[in-house]
C-alpha cells in the first residue's frame, strides 16, 4: 500500500468518530438524526485492495454500511473486534492499526463476510465481467467495496441525498474519506466504478463527472441504469450505475444482470 494512503487511513481512523457521527447525524438528515451508530468506527474500505488486478477490477460504491440486527454473528466476528482495535489505536497502540487493516483486507477470506449482501453483486461480476471467477473468488483480486458515508446505520432512509451531496466535500470527516477514495482508486485503477443506489450516483455526478450519467433506455427509466465517465482525484474511470439492489418495483435484483451486462457491452 502506498505510504501516503496508509498515513491517510491511519489519520482517518484516529478521528473522534463519536463526535463525527454526532455532527453527521444532525447535518445529514432533515430530522436531525440520520441514525448513524456513534459507538462504531467507520470502515474505510472492504477487500484486499493491495491484491487488485490494476485495470481489471471493480470498485463497488454504496451509500453506507448496514448495522446488523441484534444477535447477528457480525457483532462478534467483525464489529466488536474492530471497536477494540480502534480503541487501542486511539490509546496510542499503533500496532492496532496494522491489525485493523488486515481485518479489512481479509474480509472476504477470513470467514466474516456478509455473503447475503455481496453474493448478489459477486454473481453478476463473475457471470458477466470477470468470467474466470465465481461469485466469491471474484472478491480476491477483481472487486472491492467502499461507501459514500463510511459510518454504519440500521436504516439508510434517514440519510438525505441532497445533504450528503452538500456535505461530502465540506464536512471534515467526509472530505477526508473522499481523499481516501481517490487514493484507493489511484492505486487499484478499477476498470469500472459500480454505483449501487441513488446516493452514490448523485455524489459521483456532482463531484467527479462533467455532467449527468447517461440513462439507458427502459432499463434506465425503471431501474436507473446509467453509464458514463468520472475522474476521481485525477484518475479516469468508467461508471456503471443503477438504483439500489432490492425488492421494490424500481429496484433491480440479480435477475437483471444479463440485461445490464448487455447494455454495458453495447455502450462500451
Positions of predicted regions on the chain:
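A substrate-binding/cap region within the structured catalytic cores of diverse enzymes
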Residues: 97-143
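Proline-aspartate-enriched helix->loop->beta-strand connector
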Residues: 181-196
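A structural signal for short, well-ordered beta-strand segments and their strand-loop junctions
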Residues: 58-62, 137-147, 192-197, 241
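Active-site and ligand/interface coordination hotspots across diverse enzymes
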Residues: 1-114, 174-180, 184, 232, ...
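A short helix->loop->beta-strand "cap" motif at the edges of active sites that frequently abuts
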Residues: 56, 189-191, 232-238
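Charged, often glycine-rich, active-site loop that binds/positions anionic groups
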Residues: 141-173
